[in-house]
Amino acid sequence: MEQTIKDRILQIRKREMPEGYVKSVVGIVPADWKHYTFGDIYSERKEPGNENLPLLMVSIHSGVSDGKVDEDKLTKRTKQIEDKSQYKKAVTGDLVLNMMRAWQGAIGTVRTTGMVSPAYIVAEPDDKIYPPFMDYFTRIPRMINQIDRQSYGVTDFRKRLYWASFIIIDCILPPIEEQQKIAAILTTQDKVIELKEKRLAEKLRQKKYLMQQLLTGRKRLPSYWGEWNFPKAKEIFQNVTDKNHKGDLMVLSATQDKGIMPRNEVDIDIKYDVSSLANYKKVCQGNFVISLRSFQGGIEYSAYTGLVSPAYTVLSSKKELCDEYYKQYFKSANFINRLNVAVYGIRDGKQISFEDFGQLRIPYPPINEQTAIAQVLSAADREISLLRQDIEQEKQKKKALMQLLLTGIVRVNV
């Protein structure tokens, strides 16, 4: 970042006025940007929808959908409105917002003409604005904060943004040519993210295929051809209930995406009574854990030594094995499906017993083959992890670009 831009950011943070900037109702902005209200640049569209138009939805994450929504995924409330004439037509370039969730960011520009719920506001733009620019501009914190302030309700759950409140919201906009250039830069960044997300999806498909083939013996790695054994799980693992501790080990929780994790690193705030820790089970590094959601996400591996809820079942190995092989196998679709068949009837919140698990026949390849398979799958995991980090960096770059370009802190050459 150029030093002049760094200096400008520092000045604005100190509430000092950089050269070429002025103070406005929304903060410090470029002097040549113009002040409008939404009522100055939008008029309400009240055209009815019809059966031939695709149904569009607004997401707080991605704005307006650009194609037909899968109606099987709609809420019951949405499905109940069978008379599509109650829906509103939304034309390409219109601004659409969900009255009930606009304060959370459910707002965006229409890319494909369609129809939206009667609970949405549809606003038709005039020629002072470039619609793709507004798709980004309306979702920066400065604008969402204003929308939040103009939304009314006894609680957040009941907040609504009505047309009369929408039209008095302030916005400071650059000239149309600058709007177009900014939108082009952000659209290019979106395409970079989209391309990398497609690569990630392909890597995940490849990993899933490898798991289906290698973990079950359907496909063998070169130089491995011996027969596999398929003993019952209880012949490989044993149920361990170790409460011989002082309750001073770190408390762990099961997660479906990261395995067993320290409870203070889990996003969900899980309450527990410190006095009950004496009843918790000790889990050691290398153990596996059957949690209350294992029927849904498989069995979790613990890279930590600590304490877990007494509702969990802790597994330790009875035979020599490669931890990483079974870490991968217990998260495979093949195993989860078989586990569900074995415990048919168990619902969320019910424990899978060791007896149910122990009767399952699971693969037990030779140790050297377990290790080789684990190495292949771990390499795939590393590629996926690096790609996810790359995507997150691109998203952070987009976030920074939006904050700098859409507020005028950084100007573009037109």
Go through the PLM ranges and name each one.
Residues 23, 78-84, 155, 271-277, ...:
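Short, solvent-exposed loop/turn positions at domain surfaces
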Residues 18, 45-81, 109, 122, ...:
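DNA target-recognition patches
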Residues 31-34, 134, 170-204, 208-209, ...:
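Amphipathic alpha-helical segments
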Residues 18-22, 99-100, 114-121, 154-177, ...:
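A short glycine-rich beta-alpha junction/loop motif
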Residues 402-414:
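Acidic, low-complexity, intrinsically disordered peripheral segments
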Residues 27-32, 122-131, 149, 163-183, ...:
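Proline-centric
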Residues 17-50, 176, 222-244:
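Non-catalytic DNA-recognition/assembly elements of restriction-modification systems
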Residues 85-88, 92-143, 157, 279-335, ...:
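A short beta-sheet element
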